[in-house]
């Protein structure tokens, strides 16, 4: 069995809790079928390194016209699992970012949280008026929209203290997302973030799709240079 540190396990659980995990008397995850391998990877990590009962199940969502299948993992909420749940769940049964976020200090947890709740944008963009192809440097957002702004500030402080990552809070101003707040990494901070988490991102199709703009950024940048007749590095 590969050894992992306590920091890795703790940050993995915190990243999962703040992400897509709903924790009641049992831990529970639910994702679409395209993320089945990711669910299984999480379940395997919990079984291996926490010794908790955890299984991957499958169910059909009858509300979807295309008969989408959903897979989710359940594991008994005992020992450390219960402790970490209590860190971030209030008596009202809702998740909150608390001062315990200071323990979110390993890149594995950050990678998991972005896989759960993040998005990565950037890459080649064509201007159809001029026909020119432009390269937009990748940026990352974490969509922690369920948390109030004052709790997101605590999260920002933890990122700065533990990872030396500087972020901004950006409010959305359109449609159904109006007023929701994203944690935003600018282009420079996104590169620092990627250098930090890349060794900890699982080798899964889902993860490669999530971080695609970062994975192929060198290829894209060189393509634009060739189009413009620039010298390549």
Predicted regions: what is each one?
Residues 1-233:
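Internal intein/HINT superfamily modules and their associated LAGLIDADG
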